[in-house]
Amino acid sequence: EYISGEHLEQDIEKGIALLTECADSGDVIASYRLGKIYLQGEIMFQNLDKAERYLLLAEDNEYVQYALAKLYLQEEKYEIQKAVNYFGRSADKNHWASYQLGRIYLFGAAELTKDKEQAIEWFTKSANDGNEYAQAMLDNISKFENDLLANTIFSLFVSLSRCIQDSYDNDHK
């Protein structure tokens, strides 16, 4: 309540200190709240190491698992396999987790190849759980594939034109 200032005068430092004390004593709710605060970087400066530390203290909760998955998609902490694992653990009770898995499998990631069938499975689960965005992805999945193909071809042409330009420049120096 010190953080929100709802029933007490707002004192963010005191609120963070109390949450830290509770989290360090094993309070999973405090761990989750503190982890999210450090992950979001709105109340305090973003600190992904602290976010990870506190979220891991409460990792059995599906909301914490979702937050951990989002953490592992951050550039500084990027580990796609951990993100997929935590989204998967959270997906039974969190339709946003299954939606995110659908996106990851549809668009692919650094060490994870695209898998349209997996994407459809996750989007279907998410849509069946009430996620309208997942339903929109299912309704338009071929459009996204065509856009991906067009972007890939365009990127190849850009790379090819750079190679041709470099070769031309080297030949005409």
Please tell me what each predicted stretch does.
Residues 58-60, 117-132, 139, 153-157:
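TPR/TPR-like (Sel1-like) alpha-helical repeat modules
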